[in-house]
Amino acid sequence: MPVRKQDTQRALTLLEEYRCKLHQTEDKQLRKSIERVIGIFQSNLFQALIDIQEFYEVTLLDNPKSSDNAKPTEPVQTINTWEYSSLPNSTATCETLPSSLILNVEKYRYPDDDITSQEPSSPHMLNDGRNVELVQISEKNISQKENIQGLVSHSLISPLKTPEADTPCPPIVPVIPVIPVPAESNVIPSSTPQANPPPVIVNTDLETPAYVNGTDAEYEYEEITLERGTSGLGFSIAGGTDNPHIGDDISIFITKIISGGAAAQDGRLRVNDCILRVNEVDVHDVTHSKAVEALKEAGSIVRLYVRRRKPVTEKIMDIKLVKGPKGLGFSIAGGVGNQHIPGDNSIYVTKIIEGGAAHKDGRLQIGDKLLAVNTVCLEEVSHEDAVTALKNTSDFVNLKVAKPTTMYMNDNYAPPDITNSYSQQVDNHISPSGFIGHPLPPSPGRYSPAPKGMLEDDDLTREPRKVVLQRGTTGLGFNIVGGEDGEGIFISFILAGGPADLSGELQKGDRIMSVNGVDLKSATHEQAAAALKNAGQTVTIVAQYRPEEYSRFEAKIHDLREQMMNSSISSGSGSLRTSQKRSLYVRALFDYDKTKDSGLPSQGLNFKFGDILHVVNASDDEWWQARQVTADGESEEIGVIPSKRRVEKKERARLKTVKFNSKARGDKGQSFNDKRKKNLFSRKFPFYKNKDQSEMETSDVDQHVTSNASDSESSYRGQEEYVLSYEPVNQQEVNYSRPVIILGPTKDRVNDDLISEFPEKFGSCVPHTTRPKRDYEIDGRDYHFVTSREQMEKDIQDHRFIEAGQYNSHLYGTSVQSVKEVAERGKHCILDVSGNAIKRLQIAQLYPIAIFIKPKSVENIIEMSKRVTEEQGRKTYERAMKLEQEFTEHFTAIVQGDTLEEIYNQIKQIIEEQSSTFIWVPAKEKL
C-alpha cells in the first residue's frame, strides 16, 4: 500500500514512545539506533521522499492522460518546482526513481553488472542486495560524457548509452535512499538494507574503482559545519598525495585539535578524522598544500565531510587478582589530561610484568581498558586517581575490564601497538608501595594481529636460531647486557629503524650464543662487545630466546642500581649535594624521552625544552631525582633524569665520533651548511656549540647597518666548547608586562597579527635616531629625535640601548627606557630585534618572552610563504638553523608547525602561560 505522511507521523510517534521505555543499560545500543531512525524520519530529505512517493502514486499513476506522447502539465510543473527549489546538495538515484520520471534520463550501471537496462514501463527495483547508490549530479542537464562526480558507497558508476542519448534530458528529481523499516511499512519494495550509505568520492572518468582503505562497515561519516573564529578553524592537518601521514594512505588527517578553537568548541571533530571534502572541494586525493589551500579559501562558514573508523567493539570481563610479592604486576597509562590514545581518556594496561599476579592469572592483557577497580569507577578519571585506586586495594582485587574484540590485520588505522609505542605519557607500574617500577626501553612497535603482550611463550621458539644482519650506519642496532659471573650476553634494547629492528628476527631477552662462529656462551661483556664490533659488514648471530634468565638478570641489575642510588643519597657523594642545595630549580635546554634512555636506574621523567624542573636530589653524579613545575604548581610525580655531568659526557663522546668522521672526509672547502651539520644537532639531544665559531658567524643586522653586537657579548662568550643541558633558575616577581621577541621565519606576520588582534595587550616602542625630523613626523610618536650624535653614542656604550646600528650615516636604536615605558603601561612590547637583544634585556632586568619559530624543512618554509623561491627558502632555513645554534639557551620556547595558523596559536598560548606575576629567571649561580 502507498505510504502517506500520516503513516510516517504515526510511526514516528510509536518509535518515540518505545524509546522512552528503554531505561536499562543493556538497551543503550538499541536506544541509539532508534534515535538515529527518528532523526532520519524528521529530516527534510525524508519528508521530500514522502512527497515524491505521494506524487508518484497520486499524480502520475492515477492520471489517465499520462502517456509517452502526451505528458500532463501538472507533473512537469511539479518537477520544475523541485528542480529550482532550495534543497541543499540535491541528490538522486536512478534506482529509486519511478520509471516515468527517468524515461529520457541517462541511465547508470555498475561496470560489472550483466543485467540489461530496465524497460521504461517498469519501475527499477534493487533485488541484488546492493547498497543504495547516492549520486550527486554536477549539472542540472546532463549530456553524454559530461563530467559527473558522485558519492557512492562501494563502486564506480559509468554512463550507459541509450537510444535517446541525443534527446534533451529532463531534470533529475532529488530523493534519498530509504532506511530499513518493518516489512509491513514497505516504503519502497526491495530497497536495500542500508540507509544513507557512507559515501566516498569517485569520478566516472576513472577506469578503475577509487582506492578505499577499508570497508564501509568499518567507518562512520559525518558532516561538520564550523564557523571560522579569530584564531581560525582550530585544528591541524597532515597527509596528502605528496606526504602520506599513515603508511601509504594519502588521505588528509586531523592531527591536532587546538584548545579554545572553533573545532574544539564545536566538539565533533576528532584527531585522526579523515577529511574527504571542504565545502564543495574534493580533498580525498590531493597534495597537502591543496588541502591547506582549500581550508584557507573556504570562507567564514566551513563545511567538512569527514570519515572516521568506528569504535572497536569491546567485551566486558570481571577479573579477580590476588596480590603477590610484585603487587598486581601490570602497568597503566592514560587518564584525563594524560591521554594514552588521542581523544580517549580511558585507563589502559600497557605492560604485564612477568611473574606478577596479572601474568600468572593470564586473563589481563596489554591493550585492555580498566573500567573499575573494586567499587571505584575508573572512567573519566585522572591518571593519578587511577593509580591511587589501584594502590589502595587489599590483597584481593576485583577488576572490571573492557577487552577489544576486533583485531586489526595489517591496518594502518589500527590503534597504536601500545606494547611498544614510544609514548611520553606517564606509565605507572602497579607494584607494592616503595618499589619504583623500572620501565625497560621498548622494542620498536609494529601493528600485528594481536598485541605482543597477548603472545604466549609457546608462540616464540626457544631453540637456537641463526640471524644474519648487515651492519648499517647505526651499527647493528641493539644493546647488550650481561657477561658477569658466566650469566650470558643478552639483548636489552633494539634501536627503532636499525638493522636488528628491520630484520624482525631479534628481540629483547634473546641470549647471544655466538657471533660469526665466535662462542659467547661464557664471554665477558668486553669480549662480546669486541666480537660484535670486529664482526665486519655481514654479521651472523646465533641467538636463543631465554626470557626467564633475562628477567632474573634484569631484577639483579635493578636491585644493584637501587642500592647504588640509596648509598649515594646517604653518603652525599656527587657533584651537587642536597645538603648543600636543598632546593635546586633548573630549566631544561633539551628534550628528554625516558623510553629512549636504556640506562635508567628507575622510573624516568620526560621533559621538553623550556620545562622547569625541581631537582629534589642531586647527590648522584649520573642521575638526579626531579619533578616538573607547571603553572598550577609542582607535580607529585618524581622521576629520574640524567645529571648535567651525564648529559655532557654522553654528548661529548658522540661529538668525538662526529669530529673523527669529519676529519676523515676533509675540512677543505666546507660550506656553512657543512659546518652547521657538524656543530648543530637536534633538540632531541642537547646542543653542542662552538662559541668561537658562533661569534664569528653571528650577523642578524642588515649589511648596511653596523651593529654593536659584540660590545656586551665578551663577558659571556668564551672560546670553550660546551653542551647545553640545564640552566639554574630562580623564581622572581615582576610588576610589568614582559617584552616579546619572536625570531625565525614568519616572525613579522606573527608580530603584526598579535598587535592587530590584541591591541590592548600588545604594543610597540618608539625608536631613537640622530637623523633630522621630517615635516610630517612627530617627535615621540614616530621617533625620538636625538640632536646630539655624541650623546647617543655614549648611551650605546653605557648599554642603555638593547640594539643599535647605523644607516646612511645616521644612528638608529631601541632604548631600554622605551621598552620600559610600554611594559609599565601593562602591554607586551613587541620587539623586532636580533637575538643579541635578549641578553641585554635580561641585564636590564626586563626579562623577555623569547620564542623561536623553528622551520621543519625548506619545503615547510616554501609552503607557508608561497612567494619564496626554493633558493630563498633554503637560505631562510639556514639562517634559522644558525639562529637556533647561536641563541638556544636564551629562548623561552621553541615552536614548530605545519601552518602559520598552528604556529600563531602556539605562540599565543606560550605568551599567556608566561604572563604570570611570578616568572623563572636565570640564576647567578652556576651548576
Curated annotation (Swiss-Prot):
Its membrane topology: Peripheral membrane protein
All residue ranges annotated as the L27 domain in the record: 4-64
Major localization class: membrane
PDZ domain location: 223-310, 318-405, 466-547
Guanylate kinase-like domain sequence ranges: 737-912
Region (Disordered): 692-719
Gene Ontology MF: a single term: kinase binding
Cellular component, GO annotation: anchoring junction; apical plasma membrane; endoplasmic reticulum membrane; neuromuscular junction; neuron projection
Similarity field: Belongs to the MAGUK family.
Protein name: Disks large homolog 1
Species of provenance: Xenopus tropicalis (Western clawed frog)
Gene this chain is encoded by: dlg1
